Amino acid sequence: MNTVSPETVQAPDDDPWADWLLHQRSAGDPVYEMRIQARVAGYIDHALQRLPQTTPTSLLDFGCGDGALGLRALQRWPSLRVVFADPSLELLRRASARAEAAGVHARCRFVQLGPRGLDDLPDASFDAVLTRSALAYVPDKPRLLAQWHRLLGAGGAISLAEPIFRDEAVAACAQRAALEHAADDDAARLLRLLHRWRAHQFPDTEQALAESCHCNFSERDLFAWAAQAGFGDLRLELHIESGPSLAPDWDRFTRHTPHPYAKSLRDVLDWECGAEERTLLEGLLRHSWEQGRIVSVERMAYLSARRP
């Protein structure tokens, strides 16, 4: 773990998280990005409101990305100091620039996460840990929760907002299983194309699901792991919301990916389909898009707890 001045360090060329957060999630469209940021702000506000520690003075923003959560917390609590921690140097650079623009840089520290994770931070360093869409991508979640417990002083608290992708992966597995016994007709052909798209975004076998750190857990697992780590006063909410895609047009919809390890629909159409298959799949999906029949479903788990 290194404390860095992100502006003075050369970022590596290969940075999938920065590429996704800054470009791919909104397909490079500013209108789409504004809509996404507005939705993310809602997730952040709910996580902040659920924090049991009402007036924290030291906070760890784990997996801070571009700093959206920590900056919101600094705005909410004028005496707060925040450590922004992320493996991506480019995203730390973006968070640092945003903190400077907001006039709160003096209350910030930026830490690049390395192979040792949080091991180098001393015990009881913080009275709050917050994270959004970061724990989901950590392979050893129980260990990380135990680390957060160590980093908090007595009475310290955590508040998490994490996406739950397990249902999408289970659906992909079920779709694959159904296709193994499907007849060779037009309906099965179309289902195979839809499955091809889904399988490039979520694991579609039981083994792949078990090995996928961002899909192989549920909100109940988060609750159980936090309890095992020694946290008390646990509260869990699962929000499931459906609605139209935030993408402003068909092209941006095809170029969006739900997470950094997924391929976009456009990639699948262009690189994984033959000409006839591409015409069939894109024709069906575009018609559904234009009719407003494509619905986005988001599952977000909010977990808060306190260190006794």
Language model regions located:
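Conserved class I S-adenosyl-L-methionine
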Residues: M1-T55, A68-R72, R76, L91-R94, S159-R196
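Short alpha-helix
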Residues: H214-A229
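A short glycine-rich, Lys/Arg-flanked "PGG" loop and its adjoining helix->strand segment in the class I
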Residues: P142-A154
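A short SAM/SAH-binding and catalytic strip from SAM-dependent methyltransferases
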Residues: D127-D140, I164
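C-terminal helical/coil "lid" or tail adjacent to the Rossmann-like core of SAM-dependent
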Residues: T8-R35, R235-Q291
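Class I SAM-dependent methyltransferase SAM/SAH-binding core
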Residues: S58-F62, D66-L118
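A short acidic, Gly/Pro-enriched loop at the edge of an enzyme's catalytic core
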Residues: D119-A128
